[in-house]
């Protein structure tokens, strides 16, 4: 699952404020919340948006950001419950004023006030990537959820830095719940250096979730895949160009092959687009196989452009499902 932190520097200009020169703060939630426009939503993404630093540029990141943009592009009314010290560029992107995505329906944002926005930076050397957490926004708790959002048809818990409290697992009793647990598999030291950790609330989350999606790169202990697969109702493990493996309870896992993009430019956000597309189609059809094919087709478009500029419409995805070529099929 490609991280949105890996976006190309051309995606967004350097219009954001620089990160704080302090150790990662825990973030304190305020008594009030700032939002654009509330009301009923069909797809609720819960998790930190982030400012990711790439080649001295500050860019929009976070699974919640990409998932929300995807759900909006697929025709849903979308809300985000997050915590951040909003910079204007982030708001412009999420509510649609950047004119880069259609439709123009604004994403409804509820923000828990905090002193800092979650920020990641990646450093690369001959040994690979080292990731640092430079700032962290406030934790997200059940008390932050407005009453009208508790009945959202789809709820996507998308932790980025251990910010989602486990009580949120039980705040949406009638919703289809998607969990992308990447941010529950990260820890960091006093210098902000990120390292893998075991998913602390895995049993509780797997018991509640309708769908769990992560990549083979996210899991610190690969042997846990089979264990999680036995406990989950539906679990999808993405494998980049190989597509994904789908685990249904009491069934053998099966593969949905990836679609070939017209060109390959940037994988940023492909995993997040896959997840939101899967949940959207699974909610519409109830068919885990059809949802996997739909999500693979949607994710293939993301590779063709920079970051969220490649997020497709439903019509484009359906056309690729009919006419697209698949890897390994």
Describe the residue ranges of each PLM region.
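Conserved N-terminal subdomain of the carbohydrate kinase-like
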Residues: 35-42, 51-57, 73-163, 168-178, ...
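Conserved beta-alpha-beta core of the PfkB/ribokinase-like small-molecule kinase fold
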Residues: 154-227, 232, 242-243
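Short hydrophobic/aromatic-enriched beta-strand-loop microsegments
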Residues: 108-109, 177-181, 235-237, 255-257
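Active-site metal-binding loops of divalent metal-dependent hydrolases
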Residues: 47-49, 273
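Conserved phosphate-binding/catalytic region of the ribokinase-like
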Residues: 2-8, 12-13, 17, 30-39, ...
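Short beta-strand scaffold segments in enzyme catalytic cores
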Residues: 69, 120-122, 244-247
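Histidine-anchored nucleotide/phosphate-binding helix
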Residues: 62-73
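Charged helix-capping and loop-helix junction motifs
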Residues: 60-64, 193-200, 259-260
